[in-house]
């Protein structure tokens, strides 16, 4: 039934697009657009967001480790459907020298487990600019450190991105920040010093790390010889001290290179073997990322990144976890003892369940803007490869805006990998999703 629903929606959209193409060309009054832009610029406030509906179909890999963890007490069909509804609001109010910004996210989901609702305040902060070049902010915000597209190893404060959808908004952290900006003539054009205080208490950033500590972060930015450079540091008792560096430079008008480098002091990683014995590795975790973005004359965009995750598991450690799941699953099915499988499920909620828990990855994305002169249509193909075990995910997508403020995205994901590999042990073999997103501005 879900497949039929999605097919009918896509068919309706195609017929709608055909009607649009059949219409005569229309005239655009630029003066009306300019007046609308000016009216928007004169308002001290803004309020907008989007409404979203996203049906999804998941194809279950019943033999995979994460599938057996999720469904060990019940037999799940080979596919299941999920329906997602989302409301995103963001707004601001400005009255010099103060500004207020906020962003909320309300997500309602329905699947075989029933209905679930989650409302979050993504951002809400006050900004004070007493003089030119100085900004003081306090509240919940996203820091956006790092230059990587799919991963940001030098982003020590923000939550990690979803590499399969890295442009999606993230929930921020409660911080107090100060930004001081200076501009110069010569090779050094701009420098910015950012300082951050990150409190971690029971109801403030509680998941950030060890409670009841005030932590400190800082970033120094330079625009030097047309190259963006950042140097970061984070220290405090909630997390171990870490240092970072990133850069970005346009080698030509259509070729950009970027990179990140991060060191995490005294990083501890716990792993488990087939027998359930745990071991803890403590090290100076070194992570780095190198990438490029290339835009052709035909407006085809290529993004390529290599990510070395120093905080990830080795191939043997990931295989040890899978072996432990196998042993726990066998014990449950033969004796009814669910102790081991429940323990494995709890571990899967931590480091083992991260989007990319391994150590070496390649990210590739190619997108084509408006092929065949179809306005507001962008096909794309994304792939993430675990370079250690050879498993990967392939994500084709079609994005189209048939009318103003409406975005339609049809997307699939195909996961490929053998026994014991990262993508071979994910819960799903594939998924198909259709996202309808309507933007509004009040």
Residue spans for each PLM region:
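Outer-membrane beta-barrel "beta-signal"
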Residues: 178, 364-366, 427-442
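Detector for outer-membrane/organellar transmembrane beta-barrel domains
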Residues: 96-98, 223-226, 236, 248-382
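Beta-barrel outer-membrane channel/assembly domains of diderm bacteria
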Residues: 23-136, 398, 407-413, 427-435
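Transmembrane beta-strand segments that form the barrel wall of outer-membrane beta-barrel proteins
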Residues: 99-110, 122, 160-161, 193-201, ...
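Residue-level signature of outer-membrane beta-barrel architecture
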Residues: 39-40, 45, 53, 91-95, ...
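Residues that define the transmembrane beta-barrel architecture of outer-membrane proteins
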Residues: 43, 79-85, 117-122, 170-174, ...
């Amino acid at each position: 039934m879900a497949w039929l629903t999605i097919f009918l929606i896509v068919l309706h959209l195609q017929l709608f697009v055909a009607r649009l193409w059949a219409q005569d060309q229309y005239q655009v009054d630029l003066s009306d657009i300019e007046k609308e832009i000016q009216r928007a610029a004169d308002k001290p406030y803004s309020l907008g967001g989007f409404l979203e509906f996203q049906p999804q179909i998941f194809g279950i890999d019943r033999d995979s480790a994460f599938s057996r963890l999720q469904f060990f007490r019940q037999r799940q069909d080979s596919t299941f459907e999920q329906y997602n509804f989302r409301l995103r609001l963001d707004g601001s109010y400005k009255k010099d020298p103060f500004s207020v910004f906020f962003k909320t996210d309300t997500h309602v989901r329905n699947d075989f487990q029933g209905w679930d609702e989650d409302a979050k305040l993504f951002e809400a902060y006050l900004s004070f600019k007493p003089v030119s070049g100085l900004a003081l902010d306090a509240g919940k915000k996203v820091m956006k450190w790092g230059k990587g597209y799919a991963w940001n190893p030098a982003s020590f404060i923000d939550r990690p991105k979803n590499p399969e959808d890295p442009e999606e908004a993230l929930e921020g952290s409660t911080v107090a920040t100060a930004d001081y900006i200076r501009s110069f003539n010569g090779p050094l054009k701009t420098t910015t010093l950012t300082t951050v205080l990150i409190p971690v208490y029971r109801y403030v950033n509680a998941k950030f790390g060890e409670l009841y500590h005030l932590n400190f972060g800082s970033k120094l930015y330079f625009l030097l010889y047309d190259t963006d450079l950042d140097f970061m540091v984070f220290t405090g008792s909630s997390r171990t001290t870490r240092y970072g560096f990133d850069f970005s430079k346009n080698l030509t008008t259509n070729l950009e290179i970027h990179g990140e480098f991060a060191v995490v002091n005294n990083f501890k990683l716990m792993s488990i073997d087939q027998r359930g014995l745990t071991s803890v590795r403590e090290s100076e975790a070194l992570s780095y990322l190198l990438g490029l973005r290339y835009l052709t004359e035909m407006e085809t965009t290529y993004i390529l990144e290599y990510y070395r995750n120093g905080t990830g598991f080795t191939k043997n450690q990931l295989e040890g976890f899978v072996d432990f799941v196998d042993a726990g699953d066998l014990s449950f099915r033969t004796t009814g003892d669910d102790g081991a499988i429940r323990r494995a499920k709890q571990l899967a909620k931590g480091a083992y369940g991260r989007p990319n828990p391994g150590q070496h990855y390649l990210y590739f994305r190619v997108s084509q803007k408006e092929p065949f002169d179809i306005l507001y249509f962008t096909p794309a193909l994304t792939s993430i490869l675990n370079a250690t075990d050879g498993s990967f995910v392939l994500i084709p997508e079609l994005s189209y805006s048939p009318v103003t403020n409406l975005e339609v995205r049809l997307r699939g994901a195909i996961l490929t990998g053998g026994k014991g590999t990262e993508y071979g042990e994910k819960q799903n073999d594939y998924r198909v999703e259709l996202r309808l997103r309507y933007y509004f501005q009040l």
